[in-house]
């Protein structure tokens, strides 16, 4: 089942450039996993980054985190931060929840029927 995580990274003083470099690396690693539907990263304030990640399945989430190319940059991102806040929308399985627990994830309710993957999604659609 699809789920989405929203992350807020509060970046340590003097670590923004390193953080952005590792963030760019992780976005490239994401492209190796078609089950990672979307990554969105923005910087709404100085020393703050917010991400939205959408995963098609629990397997795609775990494969993405298990990718050795991303493990170093992810660890560096965590080290560059004073605080990381993770919220999850959807219903990941027990194994994914165990991984997410390491990030102190909280689970949020979603309005009924409001978070689904379109079963006939077409990235080339003009409508």
Short names for language-model regions:
Residues 11-38, 69-73, 126-127:
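Short amphipathic alpha-helical segments
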Residues 28-37, 54-109:
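An amphipathic, aromatic/His-enriched active-site/gating alpha helix that lines ligand/cofactor pockets
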Residues 3-9:
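Active-site-flanking beta-strand signature of metal-NTP-handling nucleotidyl enzymes
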Residues 1-2, 116-127:
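Basic/polar N-terminal segments that are highly enriched at the extreme N-terminus
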Residues 9-11, 55:
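Hydrophobic beta-strand positions in extracellular immunoglobulin-like domains
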Residues 50-51:
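Short hydrophobic/aromatic-rich beta-strand segments that constitute the beta-sheet cores
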